[in-house]
A protein has these predicted regions:
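Extended terminal accessory/targeting regions
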Residues: 1-142
Length: 142
């Protein structure tokens, strides 16, 4: 399966439509760079099959995941920007959740709970991935 250009275009258009925090940056990144940066839900070291299953479970949150993946791709290695990227993930996931279901729907609250789960997982488990992205980015520029 995997992510292809059609998926990237579809998710990127949702980022723009929802005006997620960081949407201008997402639109400025060329499609081939987005395809390289976007790996779906979960860290790079998570098996592709698991990330694909997470993508299916949380498909309404994928636009927020795309912004978050770009934040990691352009990591500066600081705690401040790590925390900001994770807070932006939560904010964008909540925007996606509120767009996906009406306020009285259980689905909306389930998606908001997923948003908080993603945020807490990234906050607790993402630091090593953040530093790894920073070091990879520096290696690419050397």
């Amino acid at each position: 399966m995997g992510t292809n250009f059609e998926d990237i275009i579809r998710i990127r258009s949702e980022v723009e439509r929802l005006h997620l925090d960081g949407w201008e940056f997402v639109l400025a990144v060329p499609l081939d760079s987005l395809l390289k940066s976007y790996n779906g839900t979960g860290p790079e070291n998570l098996r592709k099959e698991i990330r694909e299953k997470l993508d299916k479970i949380a498909k309404q949150l994928l636009p927020a995941v795309m912004v978050h993946d770009l934040d990691f791709t352009w990591s500066d290695g600081t705690v401040k920007s790590f925390n900001a990227a994770n807070k932006r993930l939560l904010k964008n996931c909540i925007i996606c959740a509120t767009d996906a279901a009406p306020w009285y729907s259980w689905k909306r609250y389930a998606l908001i709970a997923e948003a908080w789960t993603f945020y807490l997982a990234c906050k607790k488990l993402g630091w090593v991935a953040w530093l790894s992205a920073y070091h990879d980015n520096r290696q690419d520029k050397l």
